[in-house]
Amino acid sequence: MGGYKGIKADGGKVDQAKQLAAKTAKDIEACQKQTQQLAEYIEGSDWEGQFANKVKDVLLIMAKFQEELVQPMADHQKAIDNLSQNLAKYDTLSIKQGLDRVNP
């Protein structure tokens, strides 16, 4: 669980964020599929009436919302991956090395 010299970032926490983001993305996709399937099941069932329609409509809204979370989660995962890669390179950057010489 190392940090990065010159940056207040905990490598272990960054790795944990990567793992949690991947799990969250997977869970959102699974939840969206289940919600969509439930709405379709209700639509094809014998359950009728205003309440059934409202339940189905709510489920469809939830499925759409969950679907709209997929791309932002993918962007979030990419950002965390980029952060991890760039933090690992930070100490080798020439500007960082120059700053270390000026401000030891």
Curated annotation (Swiss-Prot):
Keyword Secreted: yes
SUPFAM superfamilies: EsxAB dimer-like
Mutation effect (N53A): Complete loss of interaction with EsxD
Consequences of knocking out this gene: Increased capacity to promote cytokine release by host dendritic cells. Does not modulate the apoptotic pathways of host cells.
Alphabetical UniProt keywords: Secreted, Virulence
A GO-annotated cellular component: extracellular region
Subcellular location: Secreted
Principal localisation: secreted
Cited function: Virulence factor that is important for the establishment of infection in the host. EsxB is required for EsxA synthesis as well as secretion. Mediates together with EsxA the release of S.aureus from the host cell. Also inhibits host cytokine production and thus modulates dendritic cell-mediated immunity.
Subunit structure and binding partners: Homodimer. When mixed with EsxA does not form heterodimers. Forms heterodimers with EsxD.
Name listed for the protein in its UniProt record: Type VII secretion system extracellular protein B
Species of origin: Staphylococcus aureus (strain USA300)
Gene name tied to this protein: esxB
